[in-house]
Curated annotation (Swiss-Prot):
Single GO BP term: glutamine catabolic process
Keywords: Glutamine amidotransferase, Hydrolase, Lyase, Pyridoxal phosphate
Active-site residues, record numbering mapped to chain: 78, 174, 176
Binding annotation for L-glutamine: 46-48, 110, 138-139
Family of the protein in this entry: Belongs to the glutaminase PdxT/SNO family.
The keyword Hydrolase is assigned to this record: yes
Main function: Catalyzes the hydrolysis of glutamine to glutamate and ammonia as part of the biosynthesis of pyridoxal 5'-phosphate. The resulting ammonia molecule is channeled to the active site of PdxS.
Name of the featured protein: Pyridoxal 5'-phosphate synthase subunit PdxT
UniProt cross-references to NCBIfam families, sorted A to Z: PLP_synth_Pdx2 (TIGR03800)
Length: 196
């Protein structure tokens, strides 16, 4: 099984390292053709407005939707979660509303956990994990609405931080910035369920 990491910007190298620690075959995705034969794809953290622009300019926007429709597992972390969302709030007032791929029935508020200087790590109880996960929040979004098709798997206080809808995961935090590979293992399990 081979999974991909969107490698346009952001923390893609760290995701690749975590996946390789688990023995997964990993391909960096920069072009639509790079999606061929993958079982899953991670959309990493970075800057969501830039990521949307690069996806659009690089011709990946619609192929990502097709990849999902064909059964590919997806996991968006931080900015990647924003890109997967149906509705995105809190973009710059000087820009038009930021589109999301709409593959996850959630509303996301950008940068809701604060600015770069407000970054923090917190133990997060995540459904399905046996112990708290050391979640790293950096200019992190908050999932403000979880639609009926999705389910919240973790909250920090009253803020949703991790959700799942079928074979799509979204995390408001950066799991790749820890040595803990449990969520990457969960993602590989979802990717392994793909039937070609």
């Amino acid at each position: 099984m081979t999974v991909g990491v969107l490698a346009l910007q952001g923390a893609f190298r760290e995701h690749r390292q975590r996946l390789e620690q688990l023995g997964a075959g990993v391909r960096e995705v920069r072009l639509p053709a790079d999606l061929a034969g993958l079982s899953g794809l991670i959309l990493p953290g970075g800057e969501s407005t830039t990521m949307v622009r690069l996806l659009t300019e690089g011709g990946l926007w619609h192929p990502l939707r097709d990849f999902h429709a064909a059964g590919g597992a997806l996991w968006g972390t931080c900015a990647g979660a924003i890109v997967l969302a149906r509705e995105v709030m809190g973009g710059s007032p000087s820009l038009p509303p930021q589109p999301g791929l709409g593959l996850l029935d959630i509303t996301v508020q950008r940068n809701a956990f604060g600015r770069q200087v407000d970054s923090f790590t917190a133990p997060l109880d995540i459904a399905g994990l046996d112990a708290p996960f050391p979640a790293v929040f950096i200019r992190a979004p908050v999932i403000t609405r979880v639609g009926p098709a999705a389910r919240a798997l973790a909250t920090l206080g009253d803020r949703t931080a991790h959700v799942q809808q079928g074979r799509v995961l979204a995390s408001a935090f950066h799991p790749e910035l820890t040595e803990d590979t449990r969520l990457h293992r969960v993602f590989l399990g979802l990717a392994g369920e793909r039937a070609y």
